[in-house]
Amino acid sequence: MLDIRFPARVRGLTCGLAALLMAFATAPVLAADAPALAFPGAQGAAAHTPGGRGGKIVRVTTLAADGPGSFKEAVTGKGPRIVVFEVGGVIDLGMKELRISEPFLTIAGQTAPHPGVTIIKGGLTIATHDVVIRHLRIRPGDGGLPKRSGDIDAITTVRGAHDVIVDHCSLTWATDENLSASSTRFHGENEAEWMANASRRITYSNNIVSEGLADSIHAKGEHSKGSLIHDHVNEVLIVGNLYAHNYERSPLFKGGARGQVINNLIYNPGQRAIHYNLIAEEWRGHPYSKGEMVVRGNVMRAGKSTEPLAFLMIGGSGDLDVYAQDNLIVDRVGKTSIQETGSYTTAPVKLNRVKNAPALPFGVSLLPAAKVQDAVIENVGATPWNRDLIDRRIVADVIEGRGEIIDSQDQVGGYPQYKETRKLFVDSEWNLDVMEPKSGSYPRGEPLR
């Protein structure tokens, strides 16, 4: 498990008046000043976002795409809010993206009755701050549309989004990226303003990011992509995720992007796994910003669709500072013959190797790469305690070394058709500050057949 564990609270000293005064002067002040975590095990710069804590409870009571009691009504509402589910099954968004524009939101997919909530034919765009999304499945797919007719991310942020966590979600079949942090490249007058106005303080943890559709409906053609971290996006943490069957971008950092990629399992990438690319044409008239990447304790395993590649590649025209340490990179038979770094550019770029390890992001307990595969497989996805058939198949592909990059969800069984289920949400059964069940276990049901 990648979730951290916190020490027991400080015990007061009782030996004499001086010790008692010392305890009052120090320990209680530290405890009072410590901000609450978004949820137990939250990591990164966004770990202390309140999300919707203290706001109204908004119940999703229908699987309809919109209207009273719908998911759309809940997430597009105003004010601090915690979205809970009294219905399980499939929500069809009709090839539309929902835009979250109001801050202080927690989406608690873990509250849904078995088999949980799966959103199909659509995705989420986060255009605000202090948002926590947990335990959802989002599977956009091609919707039966003709090729080159459009594109949808499963989840993405846009310019100005900050303090966002996407944790324990299953994101597949996107026709743009499965999970991205996007932005406007140059919003402001200088690099400091570009950074401040970009998406920032983002944590993507413990997600399945898989099967981006390749030759599908994206206008550019091939577009099986894992995660795009856009130009100038910063303070990003990508930790404990499973990237499987994506042709590229597991993840891609664009020009000037800065963040850490830690303890992820990347299986069956196509022509690129992790890469960095500042595209000169997009930066015309602007000075180049240097990118920064920390890449530690990750695993990359080649699969059927993997082409000749290096684990970490640099393209384009901008320089990159990188600290890479303890990354395990193997081919299909377990040989460590794949090189760690490479390039797909002839521009005079510099890959500057940082010698001293940067500080780990808040809450991260770094695992050695040799332990990452088992830890990720055990913990990853929307409902690791009872995965749906699609997640089970993807995880089985990783375990067995099979599967390939796909062009349509129809190649792997198509959209799910789970029956609607219902269960009232009872406030008293949950710790509403962190949206964890007081019983210690999430809703379960009979295994899906």
Locate the predicted segments by residue.
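N-terminal secretory signal peptides that target proteins for export/translocation
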Residues: 1-10
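Bacterial N-terminal signal peptides
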Residues: 14-25
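Acidic Gly/Asp/Thr-rich repetitive segments characteristic of extracellular carbohydrate-active
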Residues: 38-83
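Detector for repetitive beta-architecture
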Residues: 57, 80-82, 88-90, 97, ...
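Right-handed parallel beta-helix
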Residues: 92-235
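Residues in short coils/turns that link rungs of repeat/solenoid architectures in beta-rich domains
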Residues: 114, 140, 173, 200, ...
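C-terminal functional modules
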Residues: 338-449
